[in-house]
Amino acid sequence: MVWLPRVPCVAAVILLLTVLSPPVALVRDSRPWFLEYCKSECHFYNGTQRVRFLKRYFYNLEENLRFDSDVGEFRAVTELGRPDAENWNSQPEILDEKRAAVDTYCRHNYEIFDNFLVPRRVEPTVTVYPTKTQPLEHHNLLVCSVSDFYPGNIEVRWFRNGKEEKTGIVSTGLVRNGDWTFQTLVMLETVPQSGEVYTCQVEHPSLTDPVTVEWKAQSTSAQNKMLSGVGGFVLGLLFLRAGLFIYFRNQKGQSGLQPTGLLS
């Protein structure tokens, strides 16, 4: 399903319903504000094969009236919207205009946005990490973070030693970033054992092949050995760099000296 952004019908209409006397207004502005606005929505299924148009009316953030193209007339959501629903349903020209909006508004705008929204693809960024840094054989939660992708249809699966995990999976669902991209967290509840390999696999329309990111369960001693190895490697690089610096500095100093005993 493709969804167009909700568009205010004209603008938010601010109604000031309380009139204060001039002396009071000079002292303190305590007038209440009331907000009435409407939203137009277009819902598309399989492109423009099936289109649904909604016109929703709100008063103080509460919906009270709507027109649904699937219904073909106005329906009151609360008692406040009932008089308007009865009034507009009695006017054929208003109903004809709203029913035609499926074509004049929704399909028309779909053609405008089609070149931008439908072909647009943004590849996801995938990272895997545990929520707790504790010894193995303890309950832990592995997180597969999938971020900054478009469109929103995405499939995330967990594997342990090459076998797909079907239970213990929790997801945040699709989260909108507000910049035409999405993110989601898919977590696996497990008790990691030494030597196990956990894999998060992501499939998305922007990818020609699934993306896989691995997390290997290691004992504390193995982690310490790995950190020691990395630390030794970095320390070796530092000493090598210092040695090369001293060597080239000495070479430069010697080349600047004139040999003694030669006639000039």
Curated annotation (Swiss-Prot):
Q: How does it sit in the membrane?
A: Single-pass type I membrane protein
* Protein's UniProt keywords contain Glycoprotein: yes
A GO biological process this protein is involved in?
response to type II interferon
- The domain of life for this entry's organism is Eukaryota
For whether the record's keyword set contains Glycoprotein, the answer is yes
> Where, in residue ranges, is this chain on the Cytoplasmic side?
249-264
Segments for region (Beta-2)? 122-215
Q: Give any Gene Ontology cellular component.
A: MHC class II protein complex
Which region is the signal sequence?
Answer: 1-31
Connecting peptide: annotated span: 216-225
Q: Which keywords belong to this entry?
A: Adaptive immunity, Disulfide bond, Glycoprotein, Immunity, Membrane, MHC II, Signal, Transmembrane, Transmembrane helix, Ubl conjugation
The SS bond pairs are 42-106, 144-200
| Localization terms from the record | Membrane
Give residue ranges for domain Ig-like C1-type: 124-214
Residues with attached carbohydrate: 46
Annotated TM spans: 226-248
Q: Which family does it belong to?
A: Belongs to the MHC class II family.
What name goes with this protein?
H-2 class II histocompatibility antigen, I-A beta chain
Q: What is the lineage of its organism?
A: Eukaryota, Metazoa, Chordata, Craniata, Vertebrata
Primary gene name? H2-Eb1
